[in-house]
Regions:
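A short linear-motif detector with a strong N-terminal bias
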Residues: 38-39, 54-55, 100-103, 111, ...
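C-terminal regulatory/effector modules of DNA-binding transcriptional regulators
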Residues: 165, 172, 181-288
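Interdomain hinge/linker segments and adjacent boundary elements that couple functional modules
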Residues: 1-13, 17, 21, 27-31, ...
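Short alpha-helical DNA-recognition segment
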Residues: 23-43
Length: 288
């Protein structure tokens, strides 16, 4: 991506809206600032390509005649938070830029709707499942050296589900992902138990799409829609491949993924029937 934080994007959207409300062009704002801000800098701020600094934002708010104390305070808070370091940055030598982007987005999202065709969603994985999954897929030696750290990160990501104002997770999982033998039977049994446990949380919804379902849009691959309350136009779709991650930000394309998720939701088992199916498959994996 490498994506600017959602806070930066929100700030850019607000600054653009304030400028538009005053009927000013980029050039007119630059002229009014008497050299305080250039056209290029303002463009970068509005498109979140550059991190904003408080003096620049205060100057713009003055130029736009923003006297509302609460609004000024909120926008300056976004300015400060946009440059805030996340816990994952201490793993910078371990994580790819695309993975850092995903963690940053999850940390700021209010909802995640995820469809997984082959594995358990990362936000619901146990440490043992994550470790065996990573080592069973033929990692390079360079990555194998980082497995411990990657498992730590995988588990740390899950704090978004238990934080104050927790993220709302809706996961639809293909039944085949629950039956896969890519990890040991005991590990899989514990993993399915974790799904049942997490599914009892009020902010977590888990559905299973049966293996005998007719052809469906989800067969095109797994993806997640990260949502941001009050900023639906900033929703992002994350699509992971073997070598890279794709982030879809165009509103029309994001809408296609949202609609596809709704079709998958309608085709999947109910929450109650999904829990029963998970328990049934868990028993099939045998004792620990």
């Amino acid at each position: 991506m490498s994506t600017p934080t959602v806070r930066r994007r929100r700030l850019g959207v607000k600054l653009r809206a304030l400028r538009d409300a005053r009927g000013l062009t980029l050039e007119e704002v630059a002229e009014k600032s008497n050299g305080g801000i250039t056209v290029a800098k303002l463009s970068r701020l509005e498109t979140a390509r550059s991190a904003a600094k408080a003096p620049d934002v205060e100057l713009l708010l003055d130029l736009y005649g923003v006297d509302d104390r609460e609004l000024r305070t909120a926008l300056l808070a976004l300015t400060r938070e946009g440059a805030r370091r996340g816990w994952w940055q201490s793993y910078r030598g371990v994580l790819s830029p695309a993975y850092e982007d995903l963690i940053s987005l999850e940390a700021e999202a209010t909802s995640v709707r995820t469809w997984q065709i082959g594995v358990i969603p990362g936000l619901l994985q146990t440490g043992e499942y994550a470790r065996e999954l990573m080592t069973s897929i033929g990692m390079s030696e360079a990555v194998e050296d980082k497995v411990d750290a990657l498992v730590e990160v995988r588990l740390a990501r899950q704090s978004v589900l238990t934080r104050e104002s927790p993220l709302n997770l809706w996961a639809i999982i293909a039944e085949g992902a629950l039956r896969t033998r890519c990890v040991g039977a005991g590990v899989m049994r514990d993993q399915l138990g974790r799904l049942l446990e997490r599914g009892r949380r009020p902010n977590v919804t888990i559905q299973v799409l049966p293996s005998d379902s007719p052809p469906h849009v989800g067969q095109m691959g797994s993806y997640s829609v990260l949502g941001f309350e009050d900023y639906a136009d900033l929703d992002v779709v994350h699509v992971e491949s073997l070598t890279a991650a794709l982030y879809v930000e165009d509103g029309g394309q994001v809408g296609v993924y949202r609609d596809a998720f709704e079709r998958l939701r309608a085709a999947a088992l109910s929450v109650e029937a999904s829990a029963e199916r998970i328990e049934q498959i868990r028993e099939e994996h045998g004792p620990r």
